[in-house]
UniProtKB/Swiss-Prot annotation:
Species in which this protein is naturally found: Mus musculus (Mouse)
GO molecular-function terms, A-Z: calcium channel regulator activity; group II metabotropic glutamate receptor activity; scaffold protein binding
Ranges per topology, Extracellular: 19-568, 626-633, 701-726, 782-798
Protein name in UniProt: Metabotropic glutamate receptor 2
Tissues expressing this chain: Detected in neurons in brain cortex (at protein level).
The entry's keywords: Cell membrane, Cell projection, Disulfide bond, G-protein coupled receptor, Glycoprotein, Membrane, Receptor, Signal, Synapse, Transducer, Transmembrane, Transmembrane helix
Entry-listed glycosylation sites: 203, 286, 338, 402, 547
Predominant cellular place of this UniProt entry's protein: membrane
Record-level GO cellular component terms: astrocyte projection; axon; dendrite; glutamatergic synapse; neuron projection; postsynaptic membrane; presynaptic membrane
C-alpha cells in the first residue's frame, strides 16, 4: 500500500514540476539535510496564492533556523565532523500550498524504499529522478496546525521525522495517525484548559467563541468547549471565520456576537490574520467585547495595529518563552548583501523599509536603526533544530562509534529508528536559556512539548499608547496578578460580567432551563428549608431550622413558659394571692370553728371546698412549670380533681338544701343522708368519679412530653405535654356535669335563707362560674396555636374559678365572722320539728315559757319552721 501511495506521489510531483512556475527555495549544502517549512508569506486572496511577506512568523523564524544551524555546525561537541544542511520552503500560510511545497522533501525518497532498495516500475525498470535533491533527514515545521497535519500525512509515508515549533492542534498527539511527528510546543488542550480557568477565575460563565477554519481553530475550540463544560461555562454562540472571508463577512460575525448581549466575553481560537480582521470589523462597527484569545493572537503587535480601541482589555495567551539575545544581534546585523542565502530577504527588506532596489534607495537602511521585536516562538524554532541535531548526534554515536564522519549505517538515515529511538528520547538543556532559567527540552510519549503559557492583557498606558502587559502564567495551574489589569484591579470597581443569569441570592436556588445549564430562574426557598445544593431546597424537618448561611440545619430550642416571663408573672401573682387568701379563710374558719356561721355552713364540706380552692391556685404553678412526665401527670390529675373537689362539695351542699326544703314542702319525713358523715361520703364519691376518669385517661394515653410545631409557625418548637386538647375536654366534661347540676340546685334553692342565705350565695357562685367556663373553653381551644396564651388563659381561669368560690361563698361568711360578730350567736327556737307545720298553739304561746321562739322560714313560697341553728 505504501509503495502505491509513493508511486502516486511521484506522479503528482512530476506534474507539479512540469506545470508549476519557478519557486524560491533556500538550500544549504550539508552531509545531512534538514527540511524547513515556514510561512514566509501570509496567505493570499482568492486570486493569489501568497500574500505579503510575514516578518515575524516567516522571516524571523526562518532566520532562527539558519542561526541554529550555524551554531550547531560550529559546535565541536555536537555532531563533530558532520555538517547539517537545509532545504527551506515557503508555506504561504496555507495547507494546500504547503503540501505542494513539501513534495520537495520526498523527491529523493521516491526512488527508494524504506530499506534503501530502489523502486521498480511496472515495466521492470528502476524509478529515477534526474534532478533529485539530497535526501531529507528530517523536517522542521510547519507553523500552523493544518499545515503540519497535511505535511505529516505525506512525510509519514516516507518515514521522515518532523518537529514543529508552533503547531498546537490536539490531533497531532494521535500517534496512530501522526507517528513521525513531534513538537517543541504543548498541544492545544493545555491552552484550552488555561483559557477555561481564566474564565472561571473571573466568573465568566456565558461566552461566545470564534474559531478559524482548519485544525488549529476547530480542534482548539473543541478542546476549550470540553474544558468549559467541565467548569459549568456555557457557549452562547459559536462562529467560524474562513480563509477568504470578506470584510462584510467578518462584520457579520461581529453582529452575530452582538446578538448575545449577555455574553460580553468572546473566546478566540484563531490565526493571527483572522484575529486582525475580526478586530478591525469590531472597530468599524463600534462594538466592544472582552477578548480571551489563544496564542494565534498572542502578543503580536500586527494583530492589533489599527484596532487598538477594539482590542483594549483583551486577555491573550502566549507560549512561555524567553528572547534569545544572540539571535537579536544576529538578525539586526543582517542585510541583503550579507544574507544572500535567504532568497526572500530582499523582498522583506523592501517591504520593511518601503524602498526599492531598482531605485537604489534601500542601501541606506539598517535593521539596527529600527525597533526590533523578537517573535515569541523563536526559542521553539531553535529548540526544534537542536532537538533534531541531538537526536542525530545520539544516533551517530550509536551507529558510527568509531568515526566522526557518517558511516554506511547512516547512509541513508533510517527515519523510523531516528524518530522512535532518538527523537522521542532526546533530553537536553535548552540552548541560549537565561542563567536563572531551568528549561529542559524533551518530549512526552506523544511527542509533545511541556506546557507553560504566559498571560497578557492589552492595555492603554499612562502616555496614551497601547501595549501588552504580562499579568500571569499557567503551568498546570493559573497564576494571575489582577492588580495589573485595569478593569480587574481593586480600584476599578465591578468586574465585567458575562453570564446568562444573575447569581441567585443566598436563600434562592437555580431552576435551570432545559438545555441551558448557565441560564436559570432563581426560586426562593421556604423559610424552613436549607440549600442542599445550588439547585435544591431541602426541608429541615420539624423541630429544625436553617442556619444563617442556609448550608444546614440546627435544632430549634424548645420553648415553654419560664418563671420570669411576663406570661407567668401575672398568673403566678394571682395564684399566690389566692392561695394566701385561701389559707387566711381556712385559718379564720378553724379559729371560729364552733361559731354558728361556721357550723351552719357545714364545716366538713367547707374545709373540703377550701382544699379544692387551694388546689385550683396550686394548679397555676403546675401549668407554669417546665413540662416533664411528672408535671404532665400532675396536670391531668390536678386540673380535673381541683374542679371536682370544689363542685362536688357545692353540689352536695345544694343537693342537701334542695332535699331538705323539698321534703318540707311535701311534709315528708326527714331526708336521708344529710348528716355530716353522709355529706362527706357523698362528696368523696363524687370526687372519686373524677379520679376514675383521670386514671382511665392516664392508662389510655400515657403521660409524656412532646415537641409541637404549628404549620404556620415552624420556627417555634413548643415543649408540651403529649395529651390532646380533645382528651382534656373529655376529662372536664365530668366537671361540666357537676357545674350544671350544682347550678340547677342553686337556682331551685335561691330563695331559701337558711344558713345566712347560703343558697343565694351558692347561686351567685355557680352563675359566675358558668360565665367563666363559657368564656374559658372557647378561648382555650381557639388559642391552641399559641401555648403562652393558652397556658395563661388556663391558669387565670382556674384561679378565677377558685376566687369566685372565695368571693361569693366565703366572703359573706367572713364578713359576719370578722365585722358582724353579733350575728354569729345561737338563736333560741322552739323545739318543733323542721318538717312539721307551726301549730296555732305554739303561735299563741309565742314568747312564753323558757324563752324559746319559733322562727318562720319561707322557702320557695312555702313557710317552714326551723328549730336549729346549725345545719349539721
Amino acid at each position: 500500500m505504501e509503495s502505491l501511495l509513493r508511486f502516486l506521489a511521484l506522479l503528482l510531483l512530476r506534474g507539479a514540476v512540469a506545470e508549476g512556475p519557478a519557486k524560491k527555495v533556500l538550500t544549504l549544502e550539508g552531509d545531512l539535510v534538514l527540511g524547513g517549512l515556514f510561512p514566509v508569506h501570509q496567505k493570499g486572496g482568492p486570486a493569489e496564492e501568497c500574500g505579503p511577506v510575514n516578518e515575524h512568523r516567516g522571516i524571523q523564524r526562518l532566520e532562527a533556523m539558519l542561526f541554529a544551524l550555524d551554531r550547531i555546525n560550529r559546535d565541536p561537541h555536537l555532531l563533530p565532523g558532520v555538517r547539517l544542511g537545509a532545504h527551506i520552503l515557503d508555506s504561504c500560510s496555507k495547507d494546500t500550498h504547503a503540501l505542494e511545497q513539501a513534495l520537495d522533501f520526498v523527491r529523493a525518497s521516491l526512488s527508494r524504499g524504506a530499506d534503501g532498495s530502489r523502486h521498480i516500475c511496472p515495466d521492470g525498470s528502476y524509478a529515477t529522478l534526474s534532478d533529485a535533491p539530497t535526501a531529507i533527514t528530517g523536517v522542521i515545521g510547519g507553523s500552523y496546525s493544518d499545515v503540519s497535519i497535511q505535511v505529516a500525512n505525506l512525510l509519514r509515508l516516507f518515514q521522515i521525522p518532523q518537529i514543529s515549533y508552533a503547531s498546537t492542534s490536539a490531533k497531532l498527539s494521535d500517534k496512530s495517525r501522526y507517528d513521525y511527528f513531534a513538537r517543541t510546543v504543548p498541544p492545544d488542550f493545555f491552552q484550552a484548559k488555561a483559557m477555561a480557568e481564566i474564565l472561571r477565575f473571573f466568573n465568566w460563565t456565558y461566552v461566545s467563541t470564534v474559531a478559524s477554519e482548519g485544525d488549529y481553530g476547530e480542534t482548539g475550540i473543541e478542546a476549550f468547549e470540553l474544558e468549559a463544560r467541565a467548569r459549568n461555562i456555557c457557549v452562547a454562540t459559536s462562529e467560524k471565520v474562513g480563509r477568504a472571508m470578506s470584510r462584510a463577512a467578518f462584520e457579520g460575525v461581529v453582529r452575530a456576537l452582538l446578538q448575545k448581549p449577555s455574553a460580553r466575553v468572546a473566546v478566540l481560537f484563531t490565526r493571527s490574520e483572522d484575529a486582525r480582521e475580526l478586530l478591525a470589523a469590531t472597530q468599524r462597527l463600534n462594538a466592544s467585547f472582552t477578548w480571551v484569545a489563544s496564542d494565534g493572537w498572542g502578543a503580536l503587535e500586527s494583530v492589533v495595529a489599527g484596532s487598538e480601541r477594539a482590542a483594549e482589555g483583551a486577555i491573550t495567551i502566549e507560549l512561555a518563552s524567553y528572547p534569545i539575545s544572540d539571535f537579536a544581534s544576529y538578525f539586526q546585523n543582517l542585510d541583503p548583501w550579507n544574507n544572500s542565502r535567504n532568497p526572500w530577504f530582499r523582498e522583506f527588506w523592501e517591504e520593511r523599509f518601503r524602498c526599492s532596489f531598482r531605485q537604489r534607495d534601500c542601501a541606506a537602511h539598517s535593521l539596527r536603526a529600527v525597533p526590533f521585536e523578537q517573535e515569541s516562538k523563536i526559542m521553539f524554532v531553535v529548540n526544534a533544530v537542536y532537538a533534531m541535531a541531538h537526536a542525530l548526534h545520539n544516533m551517530h554515536r550509536a551507529l558510527c562509534p568509531n568515526t566522526t564522519r557518517l558511516c554506511d549505517a547512516m547512509r541513508p538515515v533510517n527515519g523510523r529508528r531516528l524518530y522512535k529511538d532518538f527523537v522521542l528520547n532526546v533530553k537536553f538543556d535548552a540552548p541560549f536559556r537565561p542563567a536563572d532559567t531551568d528549561d529542559e527540552v524533551r518530549f512526552d510519549r506523544f511527542g509533545d512539548g511541556i506546557g507553560r503559557y504566559n498571560i497578557f492583557t492589552y492595555l492603554r498606558a499612562g502616555n496614551g499608547r497601547y501595549r501588552y502587559q504580562k499579568v500571569g502564567y499557567w503551568a498546570e495551574g493559573l497564576t494571575l496578578d489582577t492588580s495589573i489589569i485595569p478593569w480587574a484591579s481593586p480600584s476599578a470597581g465591578t468586574l465585567p460580567a458575562s453570564r446568562c443569569s444573575e447569581p441567585c441570592l443566598q436563600n434562592e436556588v437555580k431552576s435551570v432551563q432545559p438545555g441551558e445549564v448557565c441560564c436559570w430562574l432563581c426560586i426562593p426557598c421556604q423559610p424552613y428549608e436549607y440549600r442542599l445544593d445550588e439547585f435544591t431546597c431541602a426541608d429541615c424537618g420539624l423541630g429544625y431550622w436553617p442556619n444563617a448561611s442556609l448550608t444546614g440545619c440546627f435544632e430549634l430550642p424548645q420553648e415553654y413558659i419560664r418563671w420570669g416571663d411576663a406570661w407567668a408573672v401575672g398568673p403566678v401573682t394571682i395564684a399566690c394571692l389566692g392561695a394566701l387568701a385561701t389559707l387566711f379563710v381556712l385559718g379564720v374558719f378553724v379559729r371560729h370553728n364552733a361559731t354558728p356561721v361556721v357550723k351552719a355552713s357545714g364545716r366538713e364540706l367547707c374545709y373540703i371546698l377550701l382544699g379544692g380552692v387551694f388546689l385550683c391556685y396550686c394548679m397555676t404553678f403546675i401549668f407554669i412549670a417546665k413540662p416533664s412526665t411528672a408535671v404532665c401527670t400532675l396536670r391531668r390529675l390536678g386540673l380535673g380533681t381541683a374542679f371536682s373537689v370544689c363542685y362536688s362539695a357545692l353540689l352536695t351542699k345544694t343537693n342537701r338544701i334542695a332535699r331538705i326544703f323539698g321534703g318540707a314542702r311535701e311534709g315528708a319525713q326527714r331526708p336521708r343522708f344529710i348528716s355530716p358523715a353522709s355529706q362527706v361520703a357523698i362528696c368523696l364519691a363524687l370526687i372519686s368519679g373524677q379520679l376514675l376518669i383521670v386514671a382511665a385517661w392516664l392508662v389510655v394515653e400515657a403521660p409524656g412530653i412532646g415537641k409541637e410545631t404549628a404549620p404556620e409557625r415552624r420556627e417555634v418548637v413548643t415543649l408540651r405535654c403529649n395529651h390532646r386538647d380533645a382528651s382534656m375536654l373529655g376529662s372536664l366534661a365530668y366537671n361540666v356535669l357537676l357545674i350544671a347540676l350544682c347550678t340547677l340546685y342553686a337556682f331551685k334553692t335561691r330563695k331559701c335563707p337558711e344558713n345566712f342565705n347560703e343558697a343565694k350565695f351558692i347561686g351567685f357562685t355557680m352563675y359566675t362560674t358558668c360565665i367563666i367556663w363559657l368564656a374559658f373553653l372557647p378561648i382555650f381551644y381557639v388559642t391552641s396555636s399559641d401555648y403562652r396564651v393558652q397556658t395563661t388563659t388556663m391558669c387565670v381561669s382556674v384561679s378565677l374559678s377558685g376566687s369566685v368560690v372565695l368571693g361569693c361563698l366565703f366572703a359573706p361568711k367572713l364578713h359576719i365572722i370578722l365585722f358582724q360578730p353579733q350575728k354569729n350567736v345561737v338563736s333560741h327556737r322552739a323545739p318543733t320539728s323542721r318538717f312539721g307545720s307551726a301549730a296555732p298553739r305554739a303561735s299563741a304561746n309565742l314568747g312564753q315559757g323558757s324563752g324559746s321562739q319559733l322562727v318562720p322560714t319561707v322557702c320557695n313560697g312555702r313557710e317552714v319552721v326551723d328549730s336549729t341553728t346549725s345545719s349539721l
